[in-house]
UniProtKB/Swiss-Prot annotation:
GO molecular function, one term: quinone binding
InterPro entries linked to this entry: NADH_UbQ_OxRdtase_chain4L/K, NUOK/Mnh_C1-like
Predominant place of localization: membrane
Source species, domain of life: Bacteria
Biological source species: Syntrophobacter fumaroxidans (strain DSM 10017 / MPOB)
Protein's UniProt keywords contain Transmembrane: yes
Membrane-spanning parts: 3-23, 29-49, 62-82
Family per record: Belongs to the complex I subunit 4L family.
Keywords, in A-Z order: Cell inner membrane, Cell membrane, Membrane, NAD, Quinone, Translocase, Transmembrane, Transmembrane helix, Transport, Ubiquinone
EC number: 7.1.1.-
Gene assigned in the entry: nuoK1
Cellular component terms (Gene Ontology): NADH dehydrogenase complex; plasma membrane
Protein name according to UniProt: NADH-quinone oxidoreductase subunit K 1
């Protein structure tokens, strides 16, 4: 049962759930979590293609580690922006954040 198609379907479901979460949420923290879910779906794709199709076994793992590092940096920067927005506006809703436009 462990075929490439199984992993690709699971990765597509993760990515689509993350995309749906970004489009549906109005809370910035929820949107950040949904973005992390999308990145995990992409990581699962890299690992699945590495497992079943890559001649060099370390390439997909290295790419997945790089994406995980970028996701951690994105989460840290995103949370710091959300904290700064909360200090200024006392809310983390997207509608309130759009009031900052000049």
């Amino acid at each position: 049962m462990n075929t490439l198609t199984t992993y690709l379907v699971i990765a597509a479901v993760l990515f689509c759930l993350g995309l749906l979460g970004i489009l549906q949420r109005r809370n910035l923290v929820g949107m950040l979590i949904s973005l992390e879910l999308m990145l995990n779906g992409a990581n699962l794709n890299f690992m699945a293609f590495n497992r079943f199709l890559a001649p060099e076994p370390a390439v997909g793992q290295i790419i997945a580690l790089i994406v995980m590092g970028l996701a951690a940096a994105e989460a840290a920067i995103g949370l710091s922006i959300i904290f700064a927005l909360f200090r200024r506006m006392h809310s983390i809703n997207v509608e309130r954040a759009q009031e900052l436009r000049g």
